[in-house]
């Protein structure tokens, strides 16, 4: 009996999903299946390919012939190279990044909410008033710094004068 490893189509229109199956070569695509080896979902990014490597190796060893699309999938997963005995030729299967769990996303949202709103809903008038208030605050801060610097200079001069007077008195 001639056995083939085929793709059996599932899914809705324009959303194909496939099973990688072992069937008699003469059966139709959706016919009786000898064994289900895995799944293939080309619509995901990257495509989801899950093939039971041990069973695929068994069926290839028994003489099952893969169709062209299945052969391409077996090369991607590295099963074909393993069957042929090609050294150092692993598959090029891309794995999707793991999604964050809903609990982690919820905790992040709580942390952001605890920090307070990041953007304020303000009108144009309030924005101008806010900008003017910020400018005033900056000007006041600069004036305070200048006043503090002048006071420090006067204090240094006063200390220097008092030291100079003390030295003059001790010299007399």
Swiss-Prot record:
InterPro entries: Ribosomal_bS16 (IPR000307), Ribosomal_bS16_dom_sf (IPR023803)
Gene3D superfamilies: 3.30.1320.10
Compositionally biased spans, kind Acidic residues: 161-172
Keyword hit for Ribosomal protein: yes
BP GO annotations: translation
Naturally occurring in which organism (per UniProt): Corynebacterium jeikeium (strain K411)
Lineage: superkingdom: Bacteria
Protein name, UniProt field: Small ribosomal subunit protein bS16
Family the entry assigns: Belongs to the bacterial ribosomal protein bS16 family.
Annotated region described as Disordered, given as residue ranges: 115-172
Pfam families named among the record's database cross-references: Ribosomal_S16 (PF00886)
One Gene Ontology molecular-function label: structural constituent of ribosome
Keyword terms: Ribonucleoprotein, Ribosomal protein
Gene this chain is encoded by: rpsP
Biased composition (Basic and acidic residues): 147-160
């Amino acid at each position: 009996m001639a056995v083939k490893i085929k793709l059996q189509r599932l899914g809705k229109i324009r959303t194909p999903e496939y099973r990688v199956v072992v069937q008699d070569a003469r059966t139709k695509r959706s016919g009786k299946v000898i064994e289900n080896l895995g799944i293939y979902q080309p619509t995901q990014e990257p495509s989801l390919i899950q093939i039971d490597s041990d069973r695929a190796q068994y069926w290839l060893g028994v003489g099952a012939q893969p169709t062209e699309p299945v052969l391409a999938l077996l090369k991607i997963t590295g099963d074909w190279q393993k069957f042929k005995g090609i050294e150092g030729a692993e598959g090029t299967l891309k794995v999707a990044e793991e999604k964050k769990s809903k609990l982690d996303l919820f905790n992040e949202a709580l942390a952001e909410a605890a920090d307070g709103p990041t953007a304020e809903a303000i009108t144009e008038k309030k924005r101008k008033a806010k900008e003017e208030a910020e400018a005033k605050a900056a000007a006041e801060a600069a004036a305070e710094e200048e006043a503090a610097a002048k006071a420090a200079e006067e204090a240094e001069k006063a200390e220097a004068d008092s030291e100079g007077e003390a030295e003059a008195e001790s010299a007399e």
